[in-house]
Amino acid sequence: MNPLIQSLTEGQLRTDIPSFRPGDTVRVHAKVVEGTRERIQIFEGVVISRKGQGISEMYTVRKISSGIGVERTFPIHTPRVDKIEVVRYGKVRRAKLYYLRALQGKAARIKEIRK
């Protein structure tokens, strides 16, 4: 990578990101702008993928809201996310959990790792 680009992106990287992987349940505190006001909206769900590296790294969180699956993709180092909390650590054997989209109810559960 170009040293100039690398030095610019290093200043943008966040250091307060917890360690989480696909299968973990996270609570994302996202900043939402409505008109002139800004508020925090909490989005809690299972991380189904994590891709990219460095400043362009992204993760996708899936939750079931009123019986409908909702997925949101966030950049890891965005200032639009106030904080990320890991609620539960899950044990999975895949890096991408897209198969959870087809499952519902108890079949979509993920085994928990006790820490």
From Swiss-Prot:
Keywords: Ribonucleoprotein, Ribosomal protein. InterPro entries: Ribosomal_bL19, Ribosomal_bL19_CS, Ribosomal_bL19_sf, Translation_prot_SH3-like_sf. It holds the Pfam family Ribosomal_L19. GO terms for biological process: translation. One of its GO terms (cellular component) is cytosolic large ribosomal subunit. It comes from the Bacteria. GO terms for molecular function: structural constituent of ribosome. This protein is located at the 30S-50S ribosomal subunit interface and may play a role in the structure and function of the aminoacyl-tRNA binding site. Belongs to the bacterial ribosomal protein bL19 family. This is Large ribosomal subunit protein bL19.
